């Protein structure tokens, strides 16, 4: 019965920009391309669809607030959880992640995430990016060998025996792990843990990159940012003259500027016309993103004004995931693929995120500039009102960060 079912918590997605991390794939795990998997485009499309669906729900629940999340991190964590799901619980998770199960098999999805994780963790001189998964397991809880093997091989998961009966000690252990992995950026992911907890799954993404054309700190000045019609705040406003991908979308009423990192990954800044934010949010789809990316063209922006900001978030996603059709994991779940018995349910889904944007990128040193072309149209872009930001990895077309900055002065 429900009251007797054992609960466990799922900690989703720690996106931390502007910090250091030491996690990497285990050296003894060799990924072999022996299995059919979802092609990169299909995986990216499903992940993008889920990203916008998740963002819209968070934006509705947090009106007029900053919204910061790592949709890719949430996708990976839910896919990781689905390793242990069976029956309709499994179907709900995968369909909630926007996979068409009439065209894609479960094993293909897992192998696609395996290859995505391998690609994300490839070492690079120009980008610091790592993805980590960890399990904190009640000391006497016996996991199925198959689940342990798949967790390690497919999702590169670490495992730590934990005494959840001493819930405060367990909470400190997990929070300290997260704090260490995020160099102190996220200090308290869990504010409470039940002594009945059996298993905690943690996923995080760490991203650090430098602008290809950095802003000069000498040109950063205090300027007005219009939070709403009746509220204005003073923020440090960076400024730059550069050639960069640009698109004016008259149909949706917004201006797009793409700033490239030295790794050729990019941050897409989307500035809606005044009063158009909600209309624009409603039209966020994978097709819209594809149209935008295909429409971006190099343009000389004579004056780009962008606020410098550092913002954090901490969300409980239970209600939001239920809105997206993922309900059974919270009650009447079949997670028998974890222990062999269907006595586990998810009691709490937590997602923490943080992002720093400054003159050098997401913390780093100045990078090489790019050439500037002459143009007769003088373009000035002032990002001085609420805007959207998406950080996209070029090679995998993955949105690792998606958010809305309503007030840059709020951490």
Curated annotation (Swiss-Prot):
The gene is SERPINA3-2. PANTHER family: ALPHA-1-ANTICHYMOTRYPSIN, SERINE PROTEASE INHIBITOR, SERPIN. One of its GO terms (cellular component) is extracellular space. CDD domains: serpinA3_A1AC (cd19551). SUPFAM superfamilies: Serpins. Its main location: cytoplasm. Belongs to the serpin family. It holds the Pfam family Serpin. It is found in: Cytoplasmic vesicle, Secretory vesicle, Chromaffin granule; Secreted. GO terms for molecular function: serine-type endopeptidase inhibitor activity. This is Serpin A3-2. The keyword Glycoprotein applies. Keywords: Cytoplasmic vesicle, Glycoprotein, Protease inhibitor, Secreted, Serine protease inhibitor, Signal. The keyword Glycoprotein applies. Glycans are attached at residues 100, 180, 230, 264. It comes from the Eukaryota. Residues 1-24 form the signal peptide. Homodimer. The record marks 377-378 as: Reactive bond. Serine protease inhibitor.
